[in-house]
Amino acid sequence: MTKSELVAQLAARFPQLVLKDADFAVKTMLDAMSEALANGHRIEIRGFGSFGLNRRPSRVGRNPKSGEKVLVPEKYVPHFKPGKELRERVDRRAGEPLKAEEPDDDL
């Protein structure tokens, strides 16, 4: 699902929201989540999962073109850990064929 599909589904589910307002709501939520992670905070959405940061220590890498050793600096990368309810829901549906065309009404 893309961001535009999420906006369209939100607008369809809540008819009082025009597409522009649904787009603003999704962008605002994603901006708030991005800002929280950028500031080193953890995000927890009960039943869905949590977003956090994992530290990747510095290491010596190799330039694939020249074979030269290069120092790859330490960095933090976003990490998602699914919650129990989400894992169970996905597991129940794992045996069913994927339906990319139909939106999930349970969201």
Curated annotation (Swiss-Prot):
Residues 82-107 are annotated as: Disordered. It comes from Paraburkholderia phytofirmans (strain DSM 17436 / LMG 22146 / PsJN) (Burkholderia phytofirmans). GO terms for molecular function: DNA binding; structural constituent of chromatin. This is Integration host factor subunit beta. Pfam families: Bac_DNA_binding. The keyword Phosphoprotein does not apply. SUPFAM superfamilies: IHF-like DNA-binding proteins. NCBIfam families: hip, PRK00199.1. Belongs to the bacterial histone-like protein family.
